[in-house]
Regions:
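Acidic, proline/glycine-enriched N-terminal capping motif
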Residues: 1-61, 65, 69-72, 346-347
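Short amphipathic beta-strand starts and helix->beta connectors
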Residues: 10-19, 60-74, 104-107, 145-155, ...
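Acidic, low-complexity central loop/insert segments
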Residues: 22-24, 30-31, 76-199
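Residue-level signal for inorganic ion chemistry
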Residues: 36, 86, 124, 230, ...
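Short, intrinsically disordered, mixed-charge
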Residues: 44-52, 98-106, 239, 271, ...
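Short, low-order "capping/linker" segments at domain edges
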Residues: 119-139, 196-208, 327-347
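Anionic-ligand-binding alpha/beta catalytic cores of soluble enzymes and soluble regulatory domains
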Residues: 160, 166-251
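Glycine-rich, small/acidic residue-mixed loop/short-helix segments
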Residues: 217-221, 231, 235-347
């Protein structure tokens, strides 16, 4: 069965997916299994999320950061009680596989590439009947967005309705399991994600991304755990500073009947200075043309924006995801200045 952007009517497919009456065969992820009795404590020590007590059948999101706290990998994790299953973007999977293999040392873990064995099927309703059973657990990843995982912190106050499940399905059984089901293309799934303000590794993450900029402290970071690469930077920005950029949702002017491209530049309306870029675009079945953009923190939250598209300038209005004042949550008291007493000169 082919992965398709749409099957002829993207907006109807999107509504069906939203209502839970269809499935989406997702772009192929890289899939890595980590088995062995040390797997959870080992992954816990390497990644941003608290994984030590992940129960069989539970899922989580975690980040692999560089030493400066920039996002290298967004990782979806399912544990079945014997094996942890990691899903990442296909183009990044070999890098993660190599790095995990290098970090094994004497830990009792086995790291294996399982990409060719599985496909990924998304829906807004969980269906254990189509998911692969491993150690009697259906392998289903539940997206924690827009909630707040234990130990997380959400900057956004935006209210969204978003339930999303990704089922690991045996690649050889996809046709059998989905052949008689209503299907939606990947454009439908992406539009629902954008409407929810949900960042993706393929769209929103670049080489400069900090978790704070994308509101990923809510779902992928446990702020009370340490000892993982990049942890000091995460804590410093969250407690004492502000992320330099912020994720925002955009309502686009649809009068030109065209969407901007990913990477198109964004500026404040009426000004020349570039303040950010488009990271994801879609046509929503209710809201019309929408996008996500990463822009400078200094851009006012209520100012109108313009997107410099290939077919012309597109007007855009913001709906705040990460606010301008995100970060600096530590309440550090200011010490009173000490007045030095002593004789005045010339007295």
């Amino acid at each position: 069965m082919q992965i398709k952007e749409h099957f002829g009517n993207p907006l109807i497919e999107q509504r069906n997916l939203f209502e839970g009456s269809s499935y989406c065969l997702m772009n192929q992820p890289g899939i890595i299994s980590v088995s062995g009795e040390d797997r959870l404590s080992w992954l816990h020590s390497l990644l941003s999320q608290n994984l030590k007590n992940l129960a069989p059948g539970d899922s989580a999101e975690a980040l692999l950061l560089d030493p400066q706290g920039h996002v290298e990998q967004m990782i979806k994790i399912i544990d079945d009680g014997q094996t942890s299953w990691l899903m990442v973007n296909l183009e990044n999977s070999q890098m993660l596989l190599d790095w995990l293999t290098k970090m094994v040392f004497r830990m009792k873990v086995v790291v294996t590439n399982r990409t060719d064995e599985f496909s990924l099927v998304g829906s807004t309703k969980k269906n254990p009947e189509i998911a692969f059973l491993s150690n009697s657990q259906p392998l289903i990843w539940k997206d924690p967005w827009p909630g707040v995982a234990p130990g997380g912190y959400r900057y956004s106050t935006r209210k969204v309705n978003y339930d999303w499940f990704e089922h690991m399905v045996e690649a050889k059984k996809v046709e059998e399991l989905l052949g008689n089901q209503a299907l939606s293309g990947t454009m439908a799934a992406d539009a629902l994600r954008i409407a929810a303000g949900r960042p993706s590794a393929m769209g929103e993450v670049d080489e400069k991304s900090l978790p704070h900029e994308l509101d990923l402290l809510a779902t992928a970071v446990h702020l009370s755990k340490g000892c993982y690469r990049g942890q000091e930077s995460v804590a410093k920005v969250h407690n004492l500073g502000h992320p330099p950029r912020r994720l925002t949702f955009l309502h686009l002017d649809g009068s030109e009947h065209s969407l901007p491209d990913v990477g198109d530049q964004v500026r404040v309306s009426g000004e020349e200075k570039i303040v950010g870029k488009i990271t994801s675009t879609g046509q929503h079945f209710e809201m019309g043309p929408i996008a996500l953009a990463v822009i400078s923190r200094s851009v006012a939250e209520d100012v109108a924006l313009e997107v410099l598209g290939s077919s012309g300038v597109i007007a855009a209005t913001q709906e705040v995801i990460v606010p301008s004042d995100a970060g600096k949550v530590a309440d550090i008291p200011k010490l009173p200045r000490l007045k030095l007493a002593g004789p005045k000169l010339g007295a």
